[in-house]
């Protein structure tokens, strides 16, 4: 009797994106804190083309809850705590954070699919995004990496046809 192999081969390919059902919230929604949530809402719209959906202010005059649409996805953000340190600010005072930030990959961050990667890249660069990698091609697909105004990391992929 021939013994079956339990070894599996994993084929790498560009990540596939499945659209959310109409009128349904995405299954996963990243939630990010910002020192200045209002500035973040405006900057993310300008640099990355996200669309502001919700802006709720807290009694302290800070952003209590914000929502931005990115394609059929959603990103939530807030700036409730006055002593919160953004990744960028944290790197200024912490050697471990500075060491981590020298790694160009996205260790903690958000992956976003876009229709036109070249146009998106130019827009982000013109708005002052910190570009961590120019547009790269090859497995797992066309992509680039960037940081926003407060040092949060973003990974942008071009949508596949089909």
Tell what function each PLM region has.
Residues 2-32, 41-42, 48-149, 156-162:
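Vicinal oxygen chelate
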Residues 34-36:
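Conserved beta-strand-loop-alpha-helix junction that forms the acyl-donor binding cleft
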């Amino acid at each position: 009797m021939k013994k079956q192999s339990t070894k599996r081969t994993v084929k790498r390919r560009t990540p596939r994106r499945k659209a959310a059902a109409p009128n349904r919230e995405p299954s996963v929604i990243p939630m990010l804190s910002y020192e200045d949530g209002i500035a973040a809402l405006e900057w993310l719209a300008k640099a990355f083309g996200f669309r502001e959906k919700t802006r709720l202010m807290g009694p302290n005059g800070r952003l209590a809850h914000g929502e931005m649409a990115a394609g059929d996805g959603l990103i939530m953000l807030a700036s409730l705590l006055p002593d919160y340190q953004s990744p960028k600010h944290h790197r200024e005072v912490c050697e471990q954070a500075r060491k981590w930030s020298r790694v160009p990959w996205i260790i903690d961050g958000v992956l976003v699919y876009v229709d036109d990667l070249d146009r998106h890249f130019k827009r982000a660069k013109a708005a002052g995004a910190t570009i961590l990698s120019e547009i790269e091609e090859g497995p797992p697909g066309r992509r680039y990496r960037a940081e926003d105004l407060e040092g949060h990391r973003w990974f942008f992929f071009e949508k596949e046809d089909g």
